[in-house]
Every structure is written in C-alpha cells, then in structure tokens.
Amino acid sequence: MSTRYIAGSAVALVTPFRKNNTIDTDALKKLVQFHIEAGTDIIIPCGTTGESPTLTSDEQFRIIRIVSEEADGKIMVAAGAGTNATAHAVELAKNAEKAGASAILSVAPYYNKPSQEGFYQHFRHIAEAVSVPIIVYNVPGRTGSNLSASTILRLARDFANIAAVKEASDNMNQIMELLEERPENFSVMTGEDMLILPFMAMGGDGVISVAANQIPSTVKQLVIAAKQGNLDEARALNRKYRRLFKMNFIESNPVPVKYCLSLMGMIEENYRLPLVPLSDENKAVLKKEMEFLGLI
C-alpha cells in the first residue's frame, strides 16, 4: 500500500511585508490560521511565491520558525530552501530543518544550467544533509533547464527522503512518465493550478498552488473531487475559477495574488524590488474578477 507523505492541496504561501519592507509577522500568523481553518494540507513558506530570492538566510529561518510555531502540528510545513549553489542549498536545507520545517522544497539549480548528473549530485548532497522529506522542484520556465524524468526517478529510488516532485514543466509526457515509473511512496505534485483537473485525473497526488492563497478550501475541494473521480464537480469548479488561475499570472507571480490578498484584507500590498505593484489596468481587471467570484 502507498504511504505517500506529500499529497493534497498545498499553498505556495506569500510573504507579507510592511511598508518599510520588513516582514509583517502578524499578517504571516494570520495567513497560517487562515489555511488551518480552510483545511489546507501543506503550507509552503519561502518559495517563489514567497519572494524567496529577496529574503536573507536569517529572514528565511525566521519565517519558517514563525510558520512552524503557528502551525503547531495542525498543518504540515514544507519550507522552501533552495538555490543554485549546492553548498548554500545544503545550508538553507539544514536551517529549514532546524527552524521546524516538516519537509523541504528545493528548486532545481537555475542560471548555471547543470547537466543531469549535476542536478543529481546537487540533490544528493541535500538529501544526505537532512533527515526530513525533500520535494524536488522542477520549473524550467524559471530555471532555464529541465530536470528530466529519468533524473527525478533516479533520485527517488536512491534516496528515501526524496519524497516528491513539484512538477511545473507543463510537459505532459514527462508527467506521465513520472506517474507510471515512480517508486511506490514517491509523490508527484503539479505546480500549475490550470492543470489540477487533468493532472489529478492522470493519477497525480495533489497541487502546490498559488490560487490556494485566495481560495484554499476551493482548491482542496477541486483536488479531492478530481482524485475521487467526481468529474462533474471538478469540471464545474475548474470552469468557475479558471480565469482566476490564469489572472494570477497576468504579471509576475506573486504580484497579482498579493494584490488580491490586500483586497481581501489579509495583507498590505507591499513587494520587494525588483517586483513592483500591478499596473492600474491589470488591477481593475483582477478586482473585477474577484468581485465576480464573491471574494471581495
């Protein structure tokens, strides 16, 4: 029987900032409680949606510690802890574990474009440095290189704590290969809200979602409906929220979703450069959709 540890609806959590660019710890705690109440399965701080490239190592540790303490065992915390320098990625992973994370999300090295063997050795060093489960994050659109299915499967077979992949390549052939060839206890999660329905229908385990920031209970409902084969319900939810899924990327993530959360009164609308606020035109479009969905 499968004992997959990483599954269901996971939120790629935003990092709330104050106007002076410091971390808004009160808003951060509020977000954690929001997801506990909504039934979100996994909360992921310090990922791309959390503006991790703009966070110092100390800030990442502090955020993970706050989220873990606020979660208090009621929700799994899988902390973003990746970068493109292997030694630094190992350090971030160790710090995330020390800060209380139940698991780690580690992005494939970006910019330096390693070979597949380089990818393997990168994640080998991380896996050997920590004891918590690791989610390997494949996002070629941001990293510039694809972590192949064969390399992901090799890692999954060789290291017991490499427990899952967040697959955001949009390559359906690669996704199918992972789902068909994976070890029994290895989870395959999509990183695309637009693909939840087909991904779950193919046998996927869940989603690491941007839209779960705004509509956590709905995303979980969609995942469950698709997983259980309730396709009429899943199609209806997908049809209703598809525009929002798309609009969350009308400009660079997490700018649109943070604007939405500010409309919902959850956070202040603040970003760290080089991210800047939405254009007025896109604000109007997104606000109209939020009103249409009854979210504000």
Curated annotation (Swiss-Prot):
Alphabetical list of Gene3D superfamilies matching this protein: Aldolase class I
Localization per Swiss-Prot or TrEMBL: Cytoplasm
Q: Which GO terms describe its cellular component?
A: cytosol
Give the pathway annotation: Amino-acid biosynthesis; L-lysine biosynthesis via DAP pathway; (S)-tetrahydrodipicolinate from L-aspartate: step 3/4
The highest taxon in the source lineage is Bacteria
Any one GO MF term held by the record is: 4-hydroxy-tetrahydrodipicolinate synthase activity
Q: What class of enzyme is it?
A: lyase
* TM regions (residue ranges): none
**Matching SUPFAM superfamilies:** Aldolase
Name the site position(s) for Part of a proton relay during catalysis: T48, Y111
Catalytic residue positions:
Y137, K166
**Which UniProt keywords are given for this protein, alphabetically ordered?**
Amino-acid biosynthesis, Cytoplasm, Diaminopimelate biosynthesis, Lyase, Lysine biosynthesis, Schiff base
Q: Which reaction does it catalyse?
A: L-aspartate 4-semialdehyde + pyruvate = (2S,4S)-4-hydroxy-2,3,4,5-tetrahydrodipicolinate + H2O + H(+)
Detail which positions bind pyruvate.
T49, I208
Primary location recorded for the protein, binned into one broad class: cytoplasm
Function, as annotated:
Catalyzes the condensation of (S)-aspartate-beta-semialdehyde [(S)-ASA] and pyruvate to 4-hydroxy-tetrahydrodipicolinate (HTPA).
| Quaternary structure (record) | Homotetramer; dimer of dimers.
Q: Which family does it belong to?
A: Belongs to the DapA family.
> What NCBIfam families is this protein classified in?
dapA
Protein's UniProt name:
4-hydroxy-tetrahydrodipicolinate synthase
Species in which this protein is naturally found:
Chlorobium phaeobacteroides (strain DSM 266 / SMG 266 / 2430)
Organism classification: Bacteria, Pseudomonadati, Chlorobiota, Chlorobiia, Chlorobiales
Name of the coding gene: dapA
